[in-house]
């Protein structure tokens, strides 16, 4: 039986191509996640949006 959590890729909105990977419970958070994290390429905190893992 499949797990309840999906792996997702958090992609920087700064356009640097930097991303973090995490997982989310698709039952509790059905929408797209978005939060602020540190982007080492631009050396500041920027919003990261959820994307698919290829």
UniProtKB/Swiss-Prot annotation:
GO terms for molecular function: structural constituent of ribosome. One of its GO terms (cellular component) is cytosolic large ribosomal subunit. Keywords: Ribonucleoprotein, Ribosomal protein. InterPro entries: Ribosomal_bL33, Ribosomal_bL33_CS, Ribosomal_bL33_sf, Ribosomal_zn-bd. Coiled coil: none annotated. GO terms for biological process: translation. It comes from the Bacteria. Belongs to the bacterial ribosomal protein bL33 family. This is Large ribosomal subunit protein bL33.
């Amino acid at each position: 039986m499949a797990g309840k959590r999906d792996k997702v890729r958090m992609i920087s909105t700064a356009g640097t191509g930097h991303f973090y990977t995490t997982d989310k419970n698709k039952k509790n958070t059905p929408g797209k996640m978005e939060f602020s994290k540190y982007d080492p390429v631009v050396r500041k905190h920027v919003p990261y949006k959820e994307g698919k893992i290829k």
